[in-house]
């Protein structure tokens, strides 16, 4: 008998309060690394009605006007009208930053760190910026090697923002959330059970003032302008049995920071795999690459994606453990959920042979310090909304599958 079940993942738009904070944190990171690529950054942001607070620890030679950066990013997201309860021009921006603790810095700093290319021995001398566990995951459910539920939730969220920004649905406001429940049979997606969209909107639409009629129009417009285009190129589509919910509370006029306070790092499941894979608990945004919460999670995704792309497994999850001030991981674990074409121990040996998981090595391999300046002072802020993984719209080093051929060849040689 086949096993049938549902799995649900959610996403949020760039105007969600927590995502505003993530994007501001990473905009600050981009600006600092663009001027000083060895900046140490742990930028935390809080937003509330009419207020932005920047706090955390930063050690950098860069000269950055934080208030201007914040206002520009808020305007880019779409909060330019005080009627939304939050505006780039009128919000108060407070800055309360400290320098990184020297007790932490001494564990991750080495004399060789400022060199562009480090030897193997030198990489061993630069430790992790903190203890922690990180996970990476990939599967072959989608072309981008991501689970289908989070892939669809992100697609809908991005499309929702796009039709707002282009003016196609000009009554939409920046805040929004999406959620998709996918039907699985024997571990493979076969259909769509539920699509949920909650979107902030104007109280009236043209001459329509009755809220029930407003909601009817929003629901109809979103189906035509958002949902149908998202599924147009996919084999799995909504059908007559799919539940389609829009603003199920009845309306969503008050939103953004006026509706809820936001905080950096509160959407870690949205940022990763939508709950389909485990999470080590550390957030990404606002952290420079010495923080393994971020850089090592990117590396683990790279490892898992190449393993699946090489055909060694249909699903692969990697866990790596780190100790502060220690370069080499204290643990490495592989799980293929019974889908591996070879034993997990064989895959583990291939990872140890072909992948770099020391923090300084990860930074060097992916050029994580240099990318912001190379890409016009914006790199990390572009992954701060709509997911850090599976982003075929961005050229991300950890999304490359350049090791897949090497893994295939190594495995073939070992078998022969």
Swiss-Prot record:
Annotated spans, Flexible loop: 100-110
GO biological process: one-carbon metabolic process; S-adenosylmethionine biosynthetic process
Compartment list: Cytoplasm
Enzyme class: transferase
Cellular component aspect of the GO annotation: cytoplasm
Residues at which Mg(2+) binds: 18
UniProt xrefs under CDD domains: S-AdoMet_synt (cd18079)
Chief location category: cytoplasm
Record: residues binding ATP: 16, 175-177, 251-252, 260, 266-267, 283, 287
InterPro entries for the chain: ADOMET_SYNTHASE_CS, S-AdoMet_synt_C, S-AdoMet_synt_central, S-AdoMet_synt_N, S-AdoMet_synthetase, S-AdoMet_synthetase_sfam
Cofactor: Mg(2+); K(+)
Gene Ontology molecular function terms on file: ATP binding; magnesium ion binding; methionine adenosyltransferase activity
Pfam families assigned to the protein according to its UniProt record, in alphabetical order: S-AdoMet_synt_C, S-AdoMet_synt_M, S-AdoMet_synt_N
Cofactor remark: Binds 2 divalent ions per subunit.
Binding residues annotated for L-methionine, in chain numbering: 57, 100, 260, 291
PROSITE patterns, A to Z: ADOMET_SYNTHASE_1, ADOMET_SYNTHASE_2
EC numbers on record: 2.5.1.6
Positions that bind K(+): 44
UniProt pathway annotation: Amino-acid biosynthesis; S-adenosyl-L-methionine biosynthesis; S-adenosyl-L-methionine from L-methionine: step 1/1
Catalytic activity annotation: L-methionine + ATP + H2O = S-adenosyl-L-methionine + phosphate + diphosphate
Its biological purpose: Catalyzes the formation of S-adenosylmethionine (AdoMet) from methionine and ATP. The overall synthetic reaction is composed of two sequential steps, AdoMet formation and the subsequent tripolyphosphate hydrolysis which occurs prior to release of AdoMet from the enzyme.
Similarity-based family: Belongs to the AdoMet synthase family.
Quaternary structure and partners: Homotetramer; dimer of dimers.
PANTHER family linked to this entry: S-ADENOSYLMETHIONINE SYNTHETASE
Alphabetized HAMAP family for the sequence: S_AdoMet_synth1
Record-given protein name: S-adenosylmethionine synthase
Taxonomic source organism: Microcystis aeruginosa (strain NIES-843 / IAM M-2473)
């Amino acid at each position: 008998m086949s096993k049938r079940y549902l799995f649900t993942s959610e996403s949020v738009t760039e105007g969600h309060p927590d995502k505003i904070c993530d994007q501001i944190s990473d905009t600050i990171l981009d600006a600092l690394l663009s001027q000083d690529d060895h900046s140490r950054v742990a930028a935390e942001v809080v937003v509330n009605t009419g207020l932005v607070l920047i706090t955390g620890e930063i050690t950098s030679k860069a000269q950055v006007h934080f208030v201007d950066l914040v206002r520009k990013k808020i305007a880019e997201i779409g909060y330019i009208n005080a009627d939304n309860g939050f505006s780039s021009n009128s919000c108060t921006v407070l800055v309360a930053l400290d320098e990184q603790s020297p007790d932490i810095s001494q564990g991750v700093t080495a004399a060789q760190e400022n060199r562009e290319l480090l030897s193997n021995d030198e990489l061993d001398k630069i430790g992790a910026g903190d203890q922690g566990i990180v996970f990476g995951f990939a599967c072959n459910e989608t072309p981008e090697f991501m689970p289908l539920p989070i892939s669809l939730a992100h697609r809908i969220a991005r499309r929702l923002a796009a039709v707002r920004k282009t003016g196609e649905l000009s009554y939409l406001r920046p805040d929004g959330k999406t959620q998709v429940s996918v039907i699985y049979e024997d571990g493979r997606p076969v259909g769509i059970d539920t699509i949920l969209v909650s979107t902030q909107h104007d109280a009236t639409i043209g001459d329509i003032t009755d809220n029930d009629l407003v909601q009817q129009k929003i629901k109809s417009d979103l189906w035509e302008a958002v949902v149908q285009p998202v599924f147009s190129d996919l084999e799995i589509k909504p059908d007559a049995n799919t539940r389609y919910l829009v603003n199920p509370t009845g309306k969503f006029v008050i939103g953004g920071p006026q509706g809820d306070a936001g905080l950096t790092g509160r959407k870690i499941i949205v940022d990763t795999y939508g709950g389909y894979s485990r999470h080590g608990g550390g957030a990404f945004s606002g952290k420079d690459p010495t923080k393994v919460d971020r850089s090592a999670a990117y590396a683990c995704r790279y490892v898992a994606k190449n393993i699946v792309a090489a055909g060694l497994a249909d699903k692969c999850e990697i866990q790596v453990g780190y100790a502060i001030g220690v370069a080499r991981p204290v643990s490495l674990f592989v799980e293929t959920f019974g889908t591996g074409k070879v034993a997990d121990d064989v895959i583990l040996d291939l990872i140890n042979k072909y992948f770099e998981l020391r923090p300084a090595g990860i930074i060097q391999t992916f050029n994580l310090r240099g990318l912001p300046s190379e890409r016009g002072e914006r790199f990390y802020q572009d992954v701060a909304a709509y997911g850090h993984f599976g982003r075929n719209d961005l050229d991300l080093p950890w999304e490359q599958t350049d090791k897949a051929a090497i893994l295939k060849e190594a495995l073939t040689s070992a078998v022969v």
